């Protein structure tokens, strides 16, 4: 089994798109023995882009997961079963080298598969509108960056929290 992708990410007027992180995230949810990912930083005539909230990962995940859904539909395979069969798990080596520790992807997929919302058939609507159900997997690094906050318990029992993070 193999995976291949060519990614071209808009950098704006200067180099520095999230091309590398997109390449590392593209197939990160899947265990496959062979792969090739070419990722390009495309400089264009407009303002510089900058990282915000998992740069490159959503774009790569959308592309890969869309193709996975198309494969499942053409092959008549349940999307969660396909993902479970090919899921990265503890011990899986990513294409760029690191080996996963416990990541919980299989457990999440199994929980989704067994949930009533997934088991319930999607009925046709009397008003002619179409309904569906989607499944996707995604990945981002746990880099262990340090953050902090200052918590103050006030005399009246209220608590104040000050942090430099938007989260």
What do these predicted regions represent?
Residues 1-60, 126-167:
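Gly/Pro-rich active-site capping loops and adjacent beta-alpha segments
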Residues 1-3, 79-80, 119-122:
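Acidic/polar loop patches that form or flank catalytic/metal-binding clefts of enzymes
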Residues 51-118:
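N-terminal leader/propeptide and maturation segments of large enzyme subunits in energy/redox metabolism
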Residues 94, 107-126, 150-154, 158-162:
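Intrinsic disorder at enzyme termini
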């Amino acid at each position: 089994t193999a995976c291949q992708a060519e990614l071209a990410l808009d950098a704006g007027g200067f180099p520095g798109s999230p091309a590398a992180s997109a390449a590392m995230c593209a197939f990160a949810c899947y265990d496959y023995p062979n792969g090739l990912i070419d990722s390009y930083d495309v400089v264009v005539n407009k303002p510089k882009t900058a990282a915000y909230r998992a740069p490159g990962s959503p774009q790569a995940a959308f592309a890969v997961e869309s193709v996975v859904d198309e494969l499942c539909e053409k092959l008549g395979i349940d999307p969660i079963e396909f993902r479970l069969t090919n899921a990265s798990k503890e011990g899986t080596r990513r294409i760029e080298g690191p080996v996963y520790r416990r990541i919980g992807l299989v457990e999440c997929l199994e929980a989704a598969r067994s949930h009533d919302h997934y088991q319930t058939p999607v009925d046709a609507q009397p008003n002619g509108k179409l309904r569906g159900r989607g499944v996707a997997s995604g990945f981002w690094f746990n880099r262990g960056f340090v953050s902090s906050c200052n918590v103050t318990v006030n005399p009246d029992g209220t608590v104040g929290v000050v942090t430099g993070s938007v989260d």
